Amino acid sequence: MAHNPRNNTGGTIDGLTTVSTFAGAFAAQAGPFTGDVFPFVMLGNHPAAGGTTTFTTNISEVSLTLLNADGTVLTTVPFAPFETLTLNSPNFQDAMYSSSPSPTQFADAVQRAEFFHTLQPGQPWHTRLSPLVVNRVNITVPRFVNIRLGNGQIIQARSYFIGTAADGSTFVLMLDLLFNFFFSNEVVNEINLGNFQTDALNLAAFPNTFLFSLNVNSPNTPGGCCVLGFHTYFFDPTVVPQPRWLSLFASWISPGLFGAGFQDVLALSHEISETFDNPLLFNPAPDWQFPGQPPNSTVCQNNLESGDPVEVLPNAAFPVTLRVRDKPFTYHPQNEALLQWFEMGATSNAIGGAFSYPNTAVLPHSAVPCPQ
């Protein structure tokens, strides 16, 4: 069954106009939540029904103009050099994976892996993305911005810092508070233009733009860094049924800036896979501890965010080589935790008994319950 998102009349959740989804649930198998049932809603058609669901991915490509303190232009940071590489990445182009008998896209391969036990041999169940560049915009970024603190005090903080990556590209560290303002405005503008839609994935793609938090005690130096992407949704509370626009931010990542293979489209693949598994951000999970933490650590989460458990590991990336402009290019999408990892069971009914995919060795066992 193929769906044309442009003609889709709405999602499958009562009271919402959004993407098509399917529902399920799992029971926690260890820890203080043993036996508790955790419902979920995921992107696409139910695996037991089969068929192929295709969602348009509306892409607004954002370039940056960075200003000096006096308002003159310091430099511009264009997205254009990364457009072709992004559109030809494993997020949108097919490659071979063990979870599919035919070449498919990266997030679809991961989703098929976690529901492999449900599929009949050769069953054509896929959730696919069709990229569409709907706009190319420029955002002007001032050198400083005024921030009102919780106590009412107003301080001036640096908005951005720049550097040069190994490939010669400019990278930008941007204050997250200011970025959130820019991102929200951009999404709302695209919604008002009709470019971002409720039955699609909607992406604001940035060039080497990494977010840092405010350093209150030293506002002219960056705080904690770096956020490379996130996924969320926008909604209109005045309309019934309520429209929800799935909205993603992801940065292109030039090589050499981060470890663990964090480069090119890793952030984009992370956010797309999490949008597949938790599109509306309300999929809970038993409290799980981040891998690699000491046994008594309470560095934990309690949601079905499949990229987060892996992003902290040294082997987060899964290299995939595709041809771009008749030349091989090796991409680095991120390995993902499978649904079975969050179940905290001793075994997994995912493909090959795996807890992660495509590299099944990244997470050799299920999640450890968060210490109480």
Task: List the predicted regions and their residue ranges.
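N-terminal module-boundary/linker segments of secreted carbohydrate-active enzymes
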Residues: 1-102, 331-372
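Active-site-proximal segment of zinc-dependent metalloprotease catalytic domains
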Residues: 173, 177-271, 275
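Metalloprotease/metallohydrolase-associated module, dominated by Zn2+-dependent proteases
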Residues: 216-258, 262, 278-372
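Intrinsic-disorder/low-complexity loop/linker signature
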Residues: 50, 71-72, 123, 136, ...
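Structural alpha-beta junctions
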Residues: 69, 74, 87, 92, ...
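Compositional signature of intrinsically disordered, low-complexity segments enriched in polar residues
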Residues: 1-48, 57, 159-190, 194-198, ...
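Low-complexity, serine/threonine/proline-enriched polar segments
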Residues: 82-166
